[in-house]
Amino acid sequence: MKIRNRHQRMVAAPPERIAALIADFDRAWPTEIAPAPRRQGHRLYDAGPMLWEEFDRPGAARAFRVVRPEGFQGEHWFELELAEGATVLRHTVEGCAVGKYEAIWRERIEPLHDLILEALLDNVDAAVASGD
């Protein structure tokens, strides 16, 4: 099953400011929903049952490839697009789920992912508004 999921928000700040907020998961991650991914080595992040490898993707502020579980293949990334007086912060997931992971994505992971991403965008907005 193909997966494509996108969230975006117009944020009243320059791209550099937003890049600094998403460079460290602890600053914007909604820990009231789920623990922030933890660095495991140089470019690996442990997010509970998922393991991500950070990689360089042209045009992306941050990008990750799914390492585990094997039933998911794909990437997710943050992009920053300059807009008039603001920046569009966009997060995209593209990949596929196979076997039992099709139902796991639809029933558990996608709804949680949507909650986390919308809360993360709220946290970025709040940090910008407060001058954090």
Model-derived regions, located:
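Intrinsic-disorder/low-complexity, polar/charged segments enriched in Ser/Thr/Lys/Arg/Asp/Glu/Gln
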Residues: K2-M10, A61, Q73-E75, A86-R90
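Hydrophobic ligand-binding cavity/cleft-lining segments
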Residues: M1-G41
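Hydrophobic pocket/interface hotspot
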Residues: I18-A28, R62-F64, L89-H91, V124
